[in-house]
Amino acid sequence: MDLPIQDSHDSSTSPKGKQPTTAEKSATKKEDKVPVKKQKTRTVFSSTQLCVLNDRFQRQKYLSLQQMQELSNILNLSYKQVKTWFQNQRMKSKRWQKNNWLKNSNGVTQGCLVNPTGNLPMWSNQTWNNSTWSNQTQNIQSWSNHSWNTQTWCTQSWNNQAWNSPFYNCGEESLQSCMQFQPNSPASDLQAALEAAGEGLNVIQQTTRYFNTPQTMDLFLNYSMNMQPEDV
């Protein structure tokens, strides 16, 4: 009789399941060995302790070992607690100073740059400069106009005075007196009148030549330039 053949179970289809590999075993061991981080306990300071610590930090930011021990004994704190508090305060102070420095530097940079409207910054008072310059220009122009008008007026008045002077009138009167002689006047009287008229004309010509010289005109112009507005 033939014996029945028993089927051999394949390892892949066996009901026992897969065996874990060495890599998986090592990974599970590492996960088991990961330590759990302990949360640091924060020290809660009382108001009195904070007041003393802040006052000491304002006066002295770095304490020696002996000073920290003395302060910790006074406040009933540990040396480590006092040291940690001072370290944290120094970091906060540096961060605060850095932020203020950045704000101040940004404000100065924005003040130096031109704003979007196209106007200049406030510290550059362009309007004041323009108004001052225009006022100075107007004063110069008004003074120059006043000087020129003074020269013109004085020259015209002087010319009028020169031509209307008694010498000129004297010559005219002499000529008019000559013209008014009657035909029956003696020859001696006519000759005397002509001589008098000639002397008057000579005086007028000499006076006109004197006032027409460059030295006299320069002297007169300098005098008119130095005259104050009140003198005109």
Curated annotation (Swiss-Prot):
Biased composition, class Polar residues, residue ranges: 11-25
Swiss-Prot/TrEMBL Sequence repeat ranges: 123-127, 128-132, 133-137, 143-147, 148-152, 153-157, 158-162, 163-167
Region (8 X repeats starting with a Trp in each unit): 123-167
Pfam families assigned to the protein according to its UniProt record, in alphabetical order: Homeodomain
DNA-binding among keywords: yes
SMART domains: HOX
Biased composition (Basic and acidic residues): 26-35
GO biological process: cell differentiation; regulation of transcription by RNA polymerase II; stem cell population maintenance
Record's keyword terms, sorted: DNA-binding, Homeobox, Nucleus, Repeat, Transcription, Transcription regulation
Gene Ontology molecular function, alphabetical: DNA-binding transcription factor activity, RNA polymerase II-specific; RNA polymerase II cis-regulatory region sequence-specific DNA binding
Recorded superkingdom: Eukaryota
Region annotated Sufficient for transactivation activity, chain positions: 123-167
Protein role: Probable transcriptional regulator.
Family under the similarity heading: Belongs to the Nanog homeobox family.
Record protein name field: Putative homeobox protein NANOG2
Organism from which the protein derives: Homo sapiens
Gene behind the chain: NANOGP1
